[in-house]
Amino acid sequence: MFRARIRGIYATALTKLALDWGFKVVQPTPQIAERFGLRPDPSPPDVTVKDHESKTGVVAIGDCPAVDHLLERLREYADPVVAKASAGLHDVFVGRVVGEGLVEGPGGLMEVPGRYVLQPGAASVFTVVKPPVGPLRGVAVPEIVVDGKLLELNTTGRVAYSRHIGEEERLRLRILAETRLKAYASIGLRFKSSAKYAGEEELAREAEELYRELLRLSQGGPPGALLRRGRCLAVVLFDKRAKFKLDEARAAVVPTVRGHHALRGQGLGRCLDLLDHVGADVYERAAAFLARGRVAIYHVKPWGEVVKMRGEVVKALEDVLVVKRTLKPGGVLDGIGARIEPGTYALTCVPRSGGYVVHSYYSASGVYLGTYVNANTEPEWGRRVVYIDLLVDKAYGPDGVERVLDEEELQRYAHMLPERLRRPEAPGGKICTPEGLTSAPPRSSSA
């Protein structure tokens, strides 16, 4: 039985599902413990689940078998977008330095922070501190980091503490680091969040085990060798359909309205609790109400990268939002070729339904420059307009000639998408104007 620690805005739904799937939920929050009748269990988890920065998904990190089992069950239930890192957090490997600030590691080339002086061509022991996901390069350091359930032993020479350890427990652990664990602390020691539940003997025992492992790893190996597997990491993104499925799971435990998780991602607190309590089915109206004035558009890549675009809603129709965005001068418009001059702006049309968003571009004087259509999951309206990019785009200038972009990228990362999202299509012939979507190029715009 795998042990899972679950945090964040999806905690109730995912705890319900995890229990149904045979996981043991450990270190539950008081609210979760009360809802599920769970007894306190300070056991360290095999997998931790927490919010993704976009609030449109979660990050799962832990022992690889536990992470893989969780991903398998999530795919079966919610059919989400899943991007698993190609190397583990704290994988320890022998890497060869190539170029400036790069090392060959598991999952491809990895960046090395500039504070380390590297000799090109030299081979050394490295540890992955930021796993590579999709096209995002990982980060590795020429240090050894050995993960345990309670502690992390490393070669940094520093003592550190998880931010989830309070001052009282931190004082106890600091005294321990200066006494019984002093020899390990002089090498480099970090107390993980589960350490606050552990006794002195348990911590000392794990420190000794990690020290022996660190000595073994310090012997190195041939270039390219993976000396120790770290923890698996995966980004799991929920589109609107998947969030509705999680609403259903939560509703089996506590009163939950349709759209609960989408609205919670908008930052709603007590007012959402009230909607849950009275059973008000008002998701569409609530989302439209929130999508007023200044909004942030969260363009979320399948691997979890978030591109944030801020703008002002200039038109709110029943079926489409029109958002005006001022662009930073410099460079050219991708797929269109027009230069971004001072005053150039975009009108972004976000349909309530449909798998696309339309960005049309205008000069400072309102002359139409071209359009970029993004294929994505059905957008979620609100003070945050959220969608997951499906990697295929279409661009056309004033001449109307269409260019399909990024098809190779879709082929490369289609495995991250559920089958239902693997054949996206960016519609052509659509242009965003101050009045909404049209198919005719405007002569000028005065938004």
From Swiss-Prot:
GO terms for molecular function: mRNA 3'-UTR AU-rich region binding; RNA endonuclease activity, producing 5'-phosphomonoesters. It is an enzyme of class 3 (hydrolase). InterPro entries: DUF402, FomD-like_sf, Ntdp-like, RNA-bd_FAU-1. Keywords: Endonuclease, Hydrolase, Nuclease, RNA-binding, rRNA processing. Its EC number is 3.1.26.-. Residues 424-447 are annotated as: Disordered. Pfam families: DUF402. It comes from the Archaea. GO terms for biological process: rRNA processing. SUPFAM superfamilies: FomD-like. Belongs to the FAU-1 family. Probable RNase involved in rRNA stability through maturation and/or degradation of precursor rRNAs. Binds to RNA in loop regions with AU-rich sequences. This is Probable ribonuclease FAU-1.
